[in-house]
A protein has these predicted regions:
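Peripheral interaction segments used for macromolecular assembly
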Residues: 1-128
């Protein structure tokens, strides 16, 4: 019985990752160009679903970088690159919604803020 449990655990952990391990993971476009890194993952406390990731883009050593909220369902993990793939170019990302230093963190949970974000990307909202 211990062998069965060990095998089950191995299968489950092959596709699971701790949220804190996602922070700092590379995000690339399908051509393999680096778009940025995941800064944090935002979870819906009530549903338990991942809402979106905040991605750091540009800058040097964190200075001058933009932070973009990216709907989680647009990111795909690619074991070949050891990171996430986002089907956007750098120029598309430059025109995307961003978070500035004055952003009210309470707005993360504001549906009036989230709906335009998902519309911008043409993504299905996680709450649907």
């Amino acid at each position: 019985m211990a062998t069965v449990n060990a095998d089950l655990t191995a299968r489950e952990t092959a596709s699971l990752i701790a949220a804190d391990k996602v922070d700092g993971t590379d995000v690339r476009n399908p051509q393999g160009e680096s778009l940025g890194t995941i800064e944090r993952v935002m979870l819906d406390k009530v549903s338990g679903k991942v809402a979106y990731a905040v991605m750091r883009f540009g800058g040097f050593l964190g200075v001058g970088a933009d932070r973009h909220p990216i709907p989680w369902n647009l990111l795909r993990y690619d074991t070949g690159v050891g990171g996430y793939v986002l089907n956007l170019s750098s120029s598309q990302l430059q025109g995307a919604p961003r978070l500035d230093d004055d952003f009210d963190r309470g707005s993360f949970s504001d549906r009036e803020w989230r709906e335009p974000l998902y519309r911008h990307y043409g993504a299905t909202p996680y709450w649907d």
